[in-house]
Swiss-Prot record:
GO terms for molecular function: glucan endo-1,6-beta-glucosidase activity; glucosylceramidase activity. This is Endo-1,6-beta-D-glucanase neg1. Belongs to the glycosyl hydrolase 30 family. The keyword Hydrolase applies. It is found in: Secreted. SUPFAM superfamilies: (Trans)glycosidases (SSF51445). It comes from Aspergillus fumigatus (strain ATCC MYA-4609 / CBS 101355 / FGSC A1100 / Af293) (Neosartorya fumigata). Keywords: Glycoprotein, Glycosidase, Hydrolase, Secreted, Signal. The lineage of its organism: Eukaryota, Fungi, Dikarya, Ascomycota, Pezizomycotina. Endoglucanase that has highest activity on the linear beta-1,6-glucan pustulan and lower activity against laminarin (beta-1,3-glucans with beta-1,6-branches). Is active on C.albicans cell walls allowing the release of a previously described cell wall proteins. Gene3D superfamilies: Glycosidases, Golgi alpha-mannosidase II. Pfam families: Glyco_hydro_30, Glyco_hydro_30C.
Length: 488
């Protein structure tokens, strides 16, 4: 739907009112598959067992004492691609401000984690580019480094978002190094030797280092250029989906041992020498190869304290994150990419947010934040033609899509600094129906419980807190419902 400024002011007033109410009593908000609930206030849960009447019932438990404390929330959000920036910049200043308030402020979704593309991705208009293409000719001094119009627009958009959301964490990920740094010499269109020319593949790291140093300095220059435009880059991954290569658009293989050595010997030291506090997150790919980030941590743990995961494994299994946590308890984890196609199930965004949170993820980012009405702009070759943004821009206005509301059921009520709590009782049957839940202790002392109901009927849910309280209320059919409970 289109959101007017008047409606936004009304929502802002509601936000302030409900914030005051939460201090003394419980509240509940819901978004559902039918679209008649969109972060809508519904009947609040009551203390005790309540009265389920003839409804189905479900029992959940939450350990809201110190023994139940798990990971700390960093934030939720999406990918800021060239498609996002291009589409957003077609809006008038007032409409864009209205939209960004809906995305970045507590009155809206309160997004606080944005992953942006360093150069082109599949969601860029033609032609594909990096920040130092140099006409395809080698530029070992990086004298041709330039953000260009699209990189500059990206940095300015992120800076504007940061001005609205002081807690915003910005993660940058490249889809490829400049073509001249690669063994095949091209940015896209060729999967043969689609690897960085860094010496590790051609000489096992004992001979020529190729362009490893230049690749490291490329990150330094990019981070400094963004900082100069007001966008502090909090973290990078050194390659998006490093085990994937495709002809037609920018991709690049970076193997696990190669990633580890690039970080340990080049990128980590380069960032440190430049006085940059930007973190390096390992991997940025699917859950089916956990040995990859483990190798990086084992060999480059001096510079890597976080791991990024995607959702595209044939059988995505978020418990991999719990297993990884058990081996690496001091390492933060994030779900940094999962797409939201228009044809996807209503609960797709809820699923790829809920599962990682239940398994030690500190943040979740969807693919992508915004697109135009044609799910673009995207590259004509290799571009994603079915990647719908959380927001669709059309004819000078915008539509907040289902995935936006499903993610906001988490992000709006689990702010940065919230502590995820241990819980039990979540279950989904083979037919797809079930109840999934995650809870948090928030910085202001309130507690949040997010309940995803994929059944075709309402369910009366009772949550038993280890602190001694019991809360009960309705979770409407095919919905995500968020309870905000007062301090224990």
């Amino acid at each position: 739907m289109r959101i007017s400024v008047g409606a936004l002011l009304g929502l802002t007033a509601l936000s302030h009112a409900t914030t005051e109410k939460r201090a003394a009593s419980a509240s509940a908000y819901c978004s559902n598959s039918a679209g008649n609930y969109k972060l809508s206030s519904i009947a609040a849960p009551v203390q005790g067992a309540g009265n389920p009447g003839s409804e189905s019932t479900w029992q959940l438990t939450v350990d809201d004492t110190s023994s139940g404390h798990k990971q700390t929330i960093v934030g939720f959000g999406a990918a800021v691609t060239d498609a996002t920036v291009t589409s957003f910049n077609t809006l008038s200043a007032s409409v864009l401000q209205d939209l960004l308030n809906k995305l970045m402020t507590p009155a809206g979704a309160n997004f606080a984690l944005m992953r942006h593309t360093i150069g082109a991705s599949d969601l860029s208009g033609d032609p594909a580019y990096t920040y130092d293409d140099n006409g395809g000719k080698a530029d070992p001094s990086l004298s041709g480094f330039n953000l260009g119009d699209r990189g500059t627009a990206m940095a300015k958009m992120l800076a504007t978002m940061k001005s609205l959301q002081p807690n915003l964490k910005i993660l940058g990920s490249p889809w490829s190094a400049p073509g001249w740094m690669k063994l095949n010499g091209v940015l896209d269109g060729n999967t043969n030797n689609n690897n960085l020319n860094d010496g590790y593949l051609t000489s096992g790291g004992t001979g020529s280092t190729g362009y490893a140093s230049q690749f490291a300095q490329y990150f330094v220059k990019y981070i400094q250029a963004y900082k100069n435009l007001g966008a502090h880059v909090d973290a990078i991954t050194i390659q998006n989906e490093p085990l994937f290569s495709s002809a037609g658009y920018p991709t690049m293989y970076v193997y696990d041992y190669e990633s580890a050595q690039l970080i340990q010997n080049y990128i980590g030291p380069a960032l440190a020498s430049a006085g940059l506090d930007t973190e390096i997150w390992a991997y940025d790919h699917n859950t089916d190869v956990p040995s990859y980030p483990q190798t990086v941590l084992n060999q480059a743990g001096q510079y890597v304290k976080s791991v990024a995961w995607h959702c595209y494994a044939p059988n995505v299994d978020w418990t991999v994150l719990s297993q990884f946590h058990n081996t690496n308890p001091g390492v933060k984890q994030y779900m940094t990419e999962c797409w939201t196609p228009a044809s996807g199930a209503w609960h797709q965004a809820a699923d790829f947010t809920m599962g990682p949170l239940q398994n030690w993820a500190s943040g979740v980012a969807a693919w992508t934040l915004g697109t135009n009405a044609q799910d673009g702009p995207h590259l004509s070759t290799g571009g994603c033609a079915t990647c719908q943004g959380l927001v669709t821009i059309n004819n000078g206005g915008y539509t907040l899509n289902t995935a936006y509301y499903m993610m906001a059921q988490f992000s709006k009520f689990m702010p940065p600094g919230a502590i995820v709590l241990n819980g039990s009782g979540s279950y989904t049957y083979s037919g797809g129906g079930g109840i999934q839940s995650v809870a948090s202790l928030n910085p202001d002392g309130t507690r949040t419980v997010v309940i995803e109901n994929t059944f075709g009927n309402d369910v009366y849910v009772t949550v038993t807190m280890k602190s001694g309280q019991k809360w009960s209320g309705n979770a409407p059919s095919q919905s995500v419902t968020t309870w905000v409970l007062p301090s224990a």
